[in-house]
Amino acid sequence: NYTQPDGTLGGFREEVKSLTAGLGADVIYDPVGGDVFDESMRCINWGGRILTIGFTSGRWPLAPVNLILIKQISVIGVRAGEYGRQDPVKGKENTDEIYRLAEEGLISPYVSHAFPIERSVEAMRLLENREVIGKAVVTMNGYEFDKESI
């Protein structure tokens, strides 16, 4: 979470550049939009791809065409459900591949919070206040969620 106390985004671009030896990311998966998209445009590698998944920030980003041209990057809209409806065969192949990667432990969601259902109001409050990074899990029937097990 790179949100600063004043609500602005800071450090995201610098962290990506640091992790990539100054080159920038080859692919950025952006479900947030807004400031994250703006920063992503500035830390994407030459020829990279930004996958726009959604706008949970509440602000639709505007893509600066000059950066797209200069860096020769691609900004790609990704709607998994629609992709599967338009091309069911390819959609199933993609879904099967995601399941395979998850089963092999190569991808897993980051879960920052887990709550029993009795505390679901607290979970919703954290989501509303943007205090959750990744996912928040609500469990039922006394199930103990182990964040390390996924």
Describe each region flagged by the PLM.
Residues 35-106, 139-150:
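Glycine-rich phosphate-binding loop and adjacent beta-alpha segment
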Residues 129-134:
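Glycine/proline-rich active-site loop of Rossmann-fold NAD(P)-dependent oxidoreductases
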Residues 61, 113-116:
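A structural signal for short, well-ordered beta-strand elements
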Residues 24-25, 107, 120:
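Local beta-strand N-terminus motif with an aromatic residue
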Residues 1-36, 90-93:
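Adenosine-nucleotide cofactor-binding segment
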Residues 115-116, 136-141:
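Short-chain dehydrogenase/reductase
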